[in-house]
Amino acid sequence: MNTPVDGGIQIEVVRVFTDATGGFGNALGIARAGDVIGADHQALAARLGYSETVVVDNPRSGTARMRIYTPTVELPFAGHPTVGAAWWLADQGTPVTTLEVPAGPVAVAEADGLVRVRARPEWAPDFTFHEFDDLELLATVDPAEFDSGHHYLWAWTDRRRGAVRARMFAPAMGIAEDEATGAAAIALTGRLGRGLEITQGRGSQLFTDYDPDGWVHLGGRVVPDHPVML
């Protein structure tokens, strides 16, 4: 039986998909599984209020099991939690090559300052994609216009380079607007069949590569933020 979160738990926080200076990025809460035994993980995520919070087991033989929560639902997979948790585990001195999430095994690598994960586009939630031709119009869309579903709004900024400007609204997950959405980046990459450089939210940056066999590699920068106590 799960019990309410009653205090004394330290939650680590990182920002995922920052720009090259460490700015912007999407905050991720990270709880060690051993610190929240018997606790209500969903209530923990709701109390923290981040777009996602993860509960991570201690790694064994280069693999760590992980569960992912938005403020309202548990997810089988998400991009920014896997990238962020992979970086955090390496920073703790326990790097992994695989994260086990409910959707399946997520391969992890790090190169050129980016943490990269490999995932299937079908692991992403069912996004509705809205392509815009006008960047100014994209910037004016009010998240309050969307009261259900998962909506990814995007426009090319440089089609030749694969550069995209994007926003994401997910009221179904309890997220009015997400700063950086890895799963949506993976899904869009799969739809377009090409690698992308995505700027989302206030200025977060996501990078993808597409494999002809259907796998997508998602990468980004991660920086530590201040931990919080519950």
Which functions belong to the PLM regions below?
Residues 1-230:
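Active-site proximal loop and beta-alpha junction motif in alpha/beta enzyme cores
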